């Protein structure tokens, strides 16, 4: 009687890289009614193009003054016009949290500008503008525990907390963030794009850490061998590096 190899030893899948054409809808205002009307007009021009088209919702260019986005409502508007949301691109903590809550993948903010679909003529590249010199402000020092639901922002400088940070608390700084106690909330350094900003904490147990819009959430951080230790977090390219203090 001949022996055959069990079928479950044969590979049933392959992982392959692929460059897919995916439309990016870059939201400039949080106005679902206007979006609904403007999408309807756009779809009327090329209905076949928008039929079941895969979509990335880019929320990373929304001005800070805009309120929280109703992400399920936004996806519903897009779906009504044939656009199927695969993921979002975001930098604001409220948008990231909304996506995680409904199990939508979150992509990091893009440093490149996408070509608008309606643009047919080549555009001459603009000369890069020299960024304005940052205004140095005194370091903001917090000496009491930061409770859940609190948000503390150090505008134009560093933020130092010499106590604990509870889950649900949020620290933001244009510069560095130092936490001399357990860091269990969210820490966002370099919120205006300073890629040289760093995060220092004596005990990394954070819900989220972010530098210049590049972030890791607790699910990723828990897998890091530095979880629960004193660490320094820095940004190299698009990668957050976590090393022991």
From Swiss-Prot:
GO terms for biological process: cell morphogenesis; division septum assembly; regulation of cell division; regulation of cell septum assembly. Keywords: Cell cycle, Cell division, Septation. InterPro entries: CAP/MinC_C, MinC, MinC_C_sf, MinC_N, Septum_form_inhib_MinC_C. It comes from the Bacteria. Pfam families: MinC_C, MinC_N. The keyword Cell cycle applies. Gene3D superfamilies: 2.160.20.70, 3.30.70.260. Residues 112-140 are annotated as: Disordered. Residues 112-132 have a biased composition (Basic and acidic residues). Interacts with MinD and FtsZ. Cell division inhibitor that blocks the formation of polar Z ring septums. Rapidly oscillates between the poles of the cell to destabilize FtsZ filaments that have formed before they mature into polar Z rings. Prevents FtsZ polymerization. NCBIfam families: minC (TIGR01222). Belongs to the MinC family. This is Probable septum site-determining protein MinC. It comes from Pseudomonas fluorescens (strain Pf0-1). The lineage of its organism: Bacteria, Pseudomonadati, Pseudomonadota, Gammaproteobacteria, Pseudomonadales.
